Design a protein with these regions (language model features):
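Cysteine/selenocysteine-centered motifs that mediate thiol-based redox chemistry or coordinate metal-sulfur cofactors
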Residues: 2-18, 83-117
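Acidic surface patches and DE-rich sequence motifs
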Residues: 50
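Short clusters of small/polar residues that mark proteolytic maturation junctions
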Residues: 60-61
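A structural motif shared across PLP-dependent enzymes of the aminotransferase-like
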Residues: 39-47, 64-80, 91-104
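Active-site-adjacent loop/helix segments that line or gate small-molecule/cofactor pockets in enzymes
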Residues: 1-44
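PLP-dependent aspartate aminotransferase-fold enzymes
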Residues: 103-180
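Generic structural signal for well-ordered beta-strand positions
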Residues: 56-57
């Protein structure tokens, strides 16, 4: 039994079955067929641990979002202390944290007037594409064949056809792909 407080699983196999049923059967099958039916249990620093406790060096780091390693103690502490005062906020109203952070960002980037916040990489790509279209008054976007830029709106349209086609990317003629 693997008990995580809010949820539990009888076995690794039962978790794999639930992941295939409710999350992403394609990824579960891909890794199982590749001989790597690993289930990540937790992450610390530059290591991952599978459900059996086996420690592995994380060479993937999922797009470079963990430059300090997973769950870096200083960052965990800052986040915890921040939660004593701040919450997720409301993007419609000014906030203390958002204004202070925006000011710091703008002051570090020459010729920047505003900071725009996004929830993740796909949203950052969306913002960049919309900004480029607005600034140039042009619609066409050039991206790299088989590239991955996210799974939302414009970002999915710039990526691999296997994703853009199934999500019915609008106006495919506006997206040109070139070799890397």
């Amino acid at each position: 039994m693997f008990n995580y407080g809010y949820f539990s699983f009888d076995s690794k196999q039962s978790l794999m079955e639930k992941a295939a049923e409710y999350w992403n059967p394609g990824k579960v099958n891909f890794w199982t067929d590749a001989g790597t039916p690993m289930v990540v249990d937790r992450r610390e620093g530059y290591f991952l641990y599978d459900m059996s406790g086996k420690r592995l060096i994380d060479l993937h780091l999922n797009g470079g979002t963990y430059n300090f390693g997973h769950r870096h103690p200083e960052l965990v502490e800052v986040l915890k202390s921040g939660l004593d005062y701040f919450d997720m906020g409301n993007h419609w109203f000014p906030s203390v944290a958002r204004a202070a952070f925006a000011e710091q960002l703008v002051k570090t980037a020459p010729h920047t007037k505003y900071a725009i916040f996004g929830a993740g990489g796909a949203e950052a790509v969306e913002i960049a594409l919309k900004t480029a279209r607005y600034a140039t008054k042009r619609k066409k976007i050039v991206s790299i064949i088989k590239g991955y830029h996210g799974h939302s709106g414009l970002s999915v349209a710039t990526g691999d056809e296997r994703f853009s086609k199934i999500f019915l990317a609008d106006n495919p003629d506006e997206f040109i792909q070139v070799p890397f």
